[in-house]
Amino acid sequence: MEELERYMKIVHYLMGIPPVRGGGMIKYATDLMIEQLRRGNDVILLIPGRVSFEKNAKCKIKKDKLYHGATVYRIDNALPVSVFNGIKDISLYTRSCDEAMVVSFFEEHKPDIFHIHTLMGLNKEWLGVAKSLKIPTVYTTHDYFGICPKGTLFKEEHVCEDSKWNTCEFCCVNAYSKKRLRIEQSKLYYFYRKNKWITGFVHKTPTIKIFKNMQALL
């Protein structure tokens, strides 16, 4: 008698899904997720959500629409997602979230494994709670964000060899402001990215700068 295959419940964390986020990491993670679903596994996607302009807004987990059959949960008011633009204000990236909220999420879903694809946007409490609940955790590093604030480990067209991080501030001189980070994780920006006719119109019309060049506004 053939041994029955054991299906798993897997929580993937990545910095977003198309059309709001794209690139190799997103392609790899979503392809993996789709294949896991095809094989009968239960897959949950956990992504950074919208950031409120309200001061001291608390993290909240909200269920979103299915993505290729996977259940999606947003962490609203999580840490900013700098992508590959560097960090200007370190305090924005070291805030804590409600540990009880994280415990509640894991206890409700009881995942067999927690698969992290980037540290961008992820509060440290997710790692601490996963460890305390003895949830096996996998980290697939698609970038260098854990050791490089730009996530590229690349400086002046060469691999950065500054092992003591003494020159990071020079690479981060053009990092996004707090206001721009919030705009790019706002409801308005999500609406913009999800509507192809709007994005196409903006990119084809040089006189419109609101979304194509937000830096000019900030």
List where the protein language model places each region.
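N-terminal subdomain of nucleotide-sugar transferases
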Residues: M1-L66, E107-H109, L133-I135
